[in-house]
Amino acid sequence: MVQEKIRIKLKAFDHKVLDQSVKQIIDTVKRSGGVIKGPIPLPTQRKVWCVLRSPHKFEQSREHFEMRIHKRLIDIENATPQTIEALMDISLPAGVDVEIKLS
């Protein structure tokens, strides 16, 4: 019997929406009989932009903008066809990027 392993990587700007999506995936996998490892929180990616507030005067006055990308990793082992079918039917909120790899 071939054991399938599914790796799901989730990314979002809002960590609350991301955690809700992870919980929804975990509940679905547990109901369909899959073995789950995770969620594993990956390092948060932080991007910062520095912008001048004034076009010509007061050059030392700057404003900083920041964007954070939160990530989670879920491994599903012993995935059955029912598990894969259930994962395909999940509707996740907008703003959550999902990457699925089968091995």
From Swiss-Prot:
Superkingdom of the source species: Bacteria
Record-level GO BP terms: translation
GO CC annotation: ribonucleoprotein complex; ribosome
MF GO annotations: structural constituent of ribosome; tRNA binding
Quaternary structure and interacting proteins, as annotated: Part of the 30S ribosomal subunit.
Record family assignment: Belongs to the universal ribosomal protein uS10 family.
Gene name of the record: rpsJ
Designated name of the protein: Small ribosomal subunit protein uS10
PANTHER family tied to this protein: 30S RIBOSOMAL PROTEIN S10 FAMILY MEMBER
Protein's job: Involved in the binding of tRNA to the ribosomes.
Keywords in alphabetical order: Ribonucleoprotein, Ribosomal protein
